[in-house]
A protein has these predicted regions:
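N-terminal leader/signal peptides at the extreme start of proteins
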Residues: 1-10
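Short, contiguous hydrophobic alpha-helices characteristic of membrane insertion segments
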Residues: 9-31
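N-terminal helix-rich module
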Residues: 2-3, 24, 28-47, 51-58, ...
Length: 174
């Protein structure tokens, strides 16, 4: 009586088919993953700026002083990061409340129509350096997607976010 011992394992053909299927699934998943990561960074950056704007407004009301939310480096704009600073009566920096570094290489923060900074007076309203009312937005563009988000300041100085699925006909920041 001859005993046959069955050997377990995969054949080369089965292994190649499995690897091919995994490669196809990875090729489909990677672009979606990149888009997901970029959109997450976009949402995170806009939420952080909105939170900092709300905190700056609250600090201005609480301390009865002017509080400014401005880019870290004025020449490069909001893409370099931003800081929240309390100003004294002469307009000099009194105290830095918060400072944020750039969040991602994929994001472009631009098309700012608030004059390069957000200035809250002691009543919590947005004003420019001469005391005139300002409203507007700071636009965020994600590099790998067509999605646009903006921080929009309303007439009372309250910040809100707006997201548009397309850079064309974006109603967020016109």
């Amino acid at each position: 009586m001859v005993l046959r011992i069955r050997q377990g394992g995969f054949t080369l053909v089965e292994l190649m088919v499995t690897i091919t299927i995994l490669a196809i699934l990875a090729a489909v998943a990677v672009p979606n993953l990149t888009s997901f990561i970029v959109n997450s960074q976009l949402r995170g950056a806009i939420s952080t700026l909105q939170s900092d704007a709300m905190n700056a407004r609250a600090e201005a009301i609480k301390s009865a002083k002017t509080v400014v939310l401005r880019p870290l480096v004025a020449a490069t704009g909001w893409t370099s990061g931003w800081q929240t600073v309390v100003l004294d009566n002469a307009g000099n920096d009194l105290q830095t409340i918060a400072s944020r570094e750039p969040s991602s290489d994929y994001l472009t923060i631009g098309k700012d129509n608030v004059g390069g900074l957000i200035r809250y007076d002691s009543a919590g309203y947005t004003r420019n350096a001469t005391g005139a009312f300002i409203a507007g937005c700071i636009r965020f563009d994600a590099g790998y997607t067509a999605r646009v988000s903006a921080l929009v300041l309303d007439a009372a100085g309250r910040p809100r976010t707006c997201t548009s699925p397309s850079t064309i006909n974006s109603s967020c920041c016109v």
